[in-house]
Structure formats: structure tokens, C-alpha cells
């Protein structure tokens, strides 16, 4: 268990910056300022999050009580005040500049807050306010009336990665800043040789494996838990290992616990599984054709081979100046090689892969949020959920693919592609996604992506770098640039 810093300081520079590398070995400088003009999701505005995205979409409600009318005014709300919330939570919402519920929140909050508690399965794209919805529900169900209650876990939120867990903690601390006695703990993999101490907090945010281990070792008491939330639920229920861990965690919890599942995507087979994990649940769904990522110009670069990919990447960054960007790679070895080459060219970069210890990972993401590293090289650790408002370019150095041993051909991972490029152009901003293609198999996967999303990914000729520079710079400047995909 690791205690989090107060929300006000969560995005400040972290002294543990040994994974931030500059060409001359010096400490990087510069920070980015964020504004809190609008409601934000997933990170709070105070933590560098992006503004809420409110496109024209409708929210479909399916109630577990088939006799009930989902259009009844009881199942919709137009103001936070109408929900009968604790005034201190309303004060926290006001401090976060939450003026009114988002469309998802309008429908989700009455269902979540109703008593007796009912399970909820919500499918909602990033930037629609789902994080705030499940956090508000969790805070509303806490009993903080005694010191003992304040030290007893009552709400458990599971996330697939350490980074997303820390981001959720920041939202909880911002929203609950006026709740006396609110303590939040993280249950994430500890650094080498460190031991988890007993959790004495009312809210716990963590990863499934660590939470399961803590409960079994009695480091965390689970018999008073009232709410279980899975964020990025499709990823956790579908991914080998994580799904089993989630089931084992749930088996250790009270039978009457309220289960809340939220994710941007729910493939059919995962949705069927989710219905068993959260039985008799109310359901919220965005119409599938409305699931779009707006403001992202999709491009691809032809490279002759793997070595040419390295050279092309270095040349690309030699041309461009962007606020922040993320490079997604398949392996840790590729991440290390790219980091070495880019540092040699004078770029300030950070590398974040699964092999990095916990405190170092925290330092890397904090420095990237603060703008002290402009380029982040990562595997799929950051493909989901993480919100850094300054990211305007994502590089698919390796196209995401499904792990299918023995398959006749390589298969693109559509959901990971969608989540990856969703790191840029977030919530109405403009961004660029560039995929690298160096052989026929990679071209086939890129073509699969175009067919699946019914979109066109524009080829950029690397023989004409003036054209490359012109296209990308114009795209970033053009606030109307959009690429939409739906299915």
C-alpha cells in the first residue's frame, strides 16, 4: 500500500526522475499549466486533464426491472443539486468546476445512487464523464462518521494499470477534498523489497492481482466493502490473467456489494461475461455508431525495413515541435533502442514499460504530465484511460496486434488501436496519429484497421520530408481536422 500525495501536488515534478533522460544528462526543465474552465475527465483539470467532450449522442438505458420505464424522470437528472448529495461533495464538484452533469452522468447517477443499490454496466467513450460518475457514487456511499469507519475499506476501484489507478486517486482527492476523514489508498505492485502495510482507508484504488493478494494476507479488510468498480472493464475481463484475478477478488467480497463496470468499449463476448460478473444490472450504452474519436488525423509512413523505421522516427522528430507525444512500441527492447537513439539526437524523452519499478513509473508519468519530458516511449501500459491534455501526436511505431499463436496471418488489435490513438486529440482537441509500416504483414494489419473502422488512413511519402512536415503541421493547426470511425 502506498499513500498518495494530495491532489494539489500530484502533477508536480517528482524528484525520482531517473527514467527521464536528456542528451546532456541534465534535468529537464519546464512545466505546463492547465486551466479548469470546464469539467474534466479522466484526470481532473487540476491534474492536467482534458475538458469534457459532449458530442451529439444519445444514451440508451436498459433497466434490470423490465417493467420500469427508462424514460421516467426518476431516471434522469439535470443538476447535481437534484441528486440530494452531501453538501461537501457538492462543494468538491464546484471546486472542480463541474457546473452540470454530462449526458452520461444525467442517466448514470440516478441509477447508481438509488437505494437499495443496483449493479450498473456502462459503456461510454473516454471524455464523457464516466470517471466522475463512479467516483461520485463511491464517495456518496461512504460512512465517515467515526474514526474506525474512516479506516475501514468501503469502496474498491480496480484498474488495469498502476498509472490509471493513480489518476483515479487524483480525481477522488479532488472531488472529496471537503470530506473530513476521507483517506484514499492505492493497492498497486510494490517496489522490490518493499512490503505492503495494512490499509486503513475508506477508499482503495488498485490493480486486481495486488488487491487479491492484500485481501488474502489480511492486509486489507474486505467485509465492509459496499461498492466495487471496474474501470476499463472490457480490458480486465477479457485479458488473460486479469479476468481470473477480477473473479477471485469478487469472490472475496460481500455478496451484496454494488458492482459497477465502466469501459469505452464492450465487445459482444465481453459484454456477455460482464452481465454474469454484474448480474441483474442496469445498463447504459452509447449507440455503437456514435462511438467516435474526433479530431484525429490518421496517417501512415512507409518504411523499407526495421532499421528504416528507426531512421524515419528520428528524422520525423527532427522536423516537428509538438507539445507532447507518445510512441507506442511492441517490446521493451524497441523502447530502449528508440530512447537511446532519440537521446543521441538531443531529444528529452521518457520510457515507460512494464519492466520499470513502481516508484520510477510514478516519476515518469508525473514528469510527462508536467511537460518535463516531451516524448514518452511506452508499450501498451498507457494505451487505456490515461489523460494528458497536451498530447497532440501518437506514433504507432508497431501496429497493435492480437496474440494468436498458430494463426495463418497476423491480426490487428482494433480496440487497442482505438484506445492508443485516443491518447491524442482527446475530448475535442486536434491530434495526429502516425502508424509505421515496414512490411506486407504490417500493411495488411493497417488495411484491416481501415476496413474495420470504415476510415481512410492517409499515406505520407517519406521521400518528400517537406510534404511530411507540411501535412502534420497543418493538421495540428487545423482545429477542424477530424477523422471519425464508428461500427
From Swiss-Prot:
Gene Ontology MF terms: ATP binding; ATP hydrolysis activity; inositol hexakisphosphate binding; RNA binding; RNA helicase activity
Alphabetical list of Pfam families matching this protein: DEAD, Helicase_C
Residue numbers covered by motif DEAD box: 231-234
Subcellular location(s) of the protein: Cytoplasm; Nucleus, Nuclear pore complex; Nucleus membrane
EC number: 3.6.4.13
Residue positions binding ATP: 124-131
GO biological process, alphabetically ordered: poly(A)+ mRNA export from nucleus; protein transport; translational termination; tRNA export from nucleus
Catalytic reaction list: ATP + H2O = ADP + phosphate + H(+)
EC category name: hydrolase
One GO CC term on file: cytoplasmic stress granule
Q motif (motif): residue ranges: 78-106
SMART domains per UniProt: DEXDc, HELICc
Topological relation to the membrane, as annotated: Peripheral membrane protein
Domain Helicase ATP-binding: from-to ranges: 111-284
Domain of life, source organism: Eukaryota
Keywords for this protein: ATP-binding, Cytoplasm, Helicase, Hydrolase, Membrane, mRNA transport, Nuclear pore complex, Nucleotide-binding, Nucleus, Protein transport, RNA-binding, Translocation, Transport
Record domain Helicase C-terminal: where: 295-468
Positions of the UniProt region annotated as Disordered: 1-53
Subunit structure: Associates with the nuclear pore complex.
Protein task: ATP-dependent RNA helicase associated with the nuclear pore complex and essential for mRNA export from the nucleus. May participate in a terminal step of mRNA export through the removal of proteins that accompany mRNA through the nucleopore complex. May also be involved in early transcription.
Protein family (similarity comment): Belongs to the DEAD box helicase family. DDX19/DBP5 subfamily.
Comment, domains: The Q motif is unique to and characteristic of the DEAD box family of RNA helicases and controls ATP binding and hydrolysis.
PANTHER family found in the cross-reference section: ATP-DEPENDENT RNA HELICASE DBP3 (PTHR47958)
Protein name: ATP-dependent RNA helicase dbp5
Gene behind the chain: dbp5
